[in-house]
Amino acid sequence: MKSLDDLDFDNRFARLGGAFSTEVLPDPIAEPRLVVASPAALALLDLPAETSDEALFAELFGGHKLWSEAEPRAMVYSGHQFGSYNPRLGDGRGLLLGEVINQAGEHWDLHLKGAGQTPYSRMGDGRAVLRSSIREFLASEALPALGIPSSRALCVIGSSTPVWREKKESAATLLRLAPSHVRFGHFEYFYYTRQHDQLKQLAAFVLEHHFADCNAAERPYAAMFRQVVERNAELIARWQAYGFCHGVMNTDNMSILGITFDYGPYAFLDDFDANHICNHSDDAGRYSFSNQVPIAHWNLAALAQALTPLVEVDELRASLDLFLPLYQAHYLDLMRRRLGLGVAAENDHALVQELLQRMQGSAVDYSLFFRRLGEETPERALASLRDDFVDREAFDRWAEAYRRRVEEEGGDQESRRRRMHAVNPLYVLRNYLAQQAIEAAEQGDYTEVRLLHQVLSRPFEEQPGMERFTRRPPDWGRHLEISCSS
């Protein structure tokens, strides 16, 4: 085991030079204290699960102390925001502190969010608030537990530093981990500023360190883009299958690695609503739940445009054309498993789509439906779920088709139950649960956020005494729309 003050650094991105990032020191927050830490994220750096030295966490991630090998830098990038190109974005409040190598030889970026102003702050104060930091922490650890690729969160540090958003709040920092923080927007920045040498340098860097297997291809950059398409097709399929709505799918929020990145006003669906908008700033619904698939394809096309100096257009188009069929195959496989079906059949797509149509407008809890479906035999489970649907005759027709499908596959109920419970979570990160934890933390009580994080780290297992985390939201907590303000 390593200790927190003795990490091994190898700052590869910093060595790219000043065209890619600017050296900036963290601006300390006042009276830093540890709010919550993730044992699973600590393990990625070979650190012990217990956080016995909370003062050291607070010093390092509150901006008061740096490792001697750290090289904090603010990265420059651009991006399309709500469909419009913004030529200069960059890390406006976050710093890449450096890259740590664990005992397995893996590199992990240490990125401190809320570290103060940078050259890219665009009139902002460079701070993050406790509210948004807790939300990002919880999601960063909840999604991987569900099998959804994501950046990770090591810890949240609170403070007494005041910041003003819609109201006065307290500043916080979040330490984010990821194998890379390179975004689609990095490539767009060098493309639109016509810095094609730097564009190629960035592509070579990403190829060498994150897509090394593509080096053997006849055209490595084309092979790399194809893998980016493949990874994003699987990622979005997992979002859709588990009812995750990102909320701000700007190209600067898209990771080149195909992982969930830059959490803002996200939400997991409570009642199923294909048109759910979780971001109250998204008046047109560009990033609604149902739009995430076409928007991901649009974003990949924006990345493809930025790669045209390196890859032939026909090759880029061919890879883009793979996105939808790859997405559909991944999504159908995930939904088949959620329904307890192990063998593909011709009518599976229709079975899934019919279920979603029956759910729409019926106030059916998306996550609990699948969990309850596996609790008992299909006949009993379907009978108990029937009352949740508005058009019960239509549901009965779907239920009969599903029952026949299960019967065709055969197998015993206990095996079916175990199989379904392994992929259908009992605990999901509902917005109202996060809000309750945030409100307690804002009063200095971190018990709830730590407990919620602990529960969400094992979403498929029944945890005695934690029944309250399985409940549907109260009236005040239904269909919460979250602000981008953070």
UniProtKB/Swiss-Prot annotation:
Mg(2+) binds at N253, D262. ATP binds at G90, G92, R93, K113, D125, G126, R176, R183, D262. It catalyses: L-seryl-[protein] + ATP = 3-O-(5'-adenylyl)-L-seryl-[protein] + diphosphate; L-threonyl-[protein] + ATP = 3-O-(5'-adenylyl)-L-threonyl-[protein] + diphosphate; L-tyrosyl-[protein] + ATP = O-(5'-adenylyl)-L-tyrosyl-[protein] + diphosphate; L-histidyl-[protein] + UTP = N(tele)-(5'-uridylyl)-L-histidyl-[protein] + diphosphate. One of its GO terms (molecular function) is ATP binding. InterPro entries: SelO (IPR003846). Keywords: ATP-binding, Magnesium, Manganese, Metal-binding, Nucleotide-binding, Nucleotidyltransferase, Transferase. The keyword Nucleus does not apply. It is an enzyme of class 2 (transferase). The active site is at D252 (proton acceptor). Its cofactor is Mg(2+); Mn(2+). Its EC number is 2.7.7.-, 2.7.7.108. It comes from the Bacteria. The keyword Lipoprotein does not apply. Nucleotidyltransferase involved in the post-translational modification of proteins. It can catalyze the addition of adenosine monophosphate (AMP) or uridine monophosphate (UMP) to a protein, resulting in modifications known as AMPylation and UMPylation. Belongs to the SELO family. This is Protein nucleotidyltransferase YdiU. The lineage of its organism: Bacteria, Pseudomonadati, Pseudomonadota, Gammaproteobacteria, Pseudomonadales.
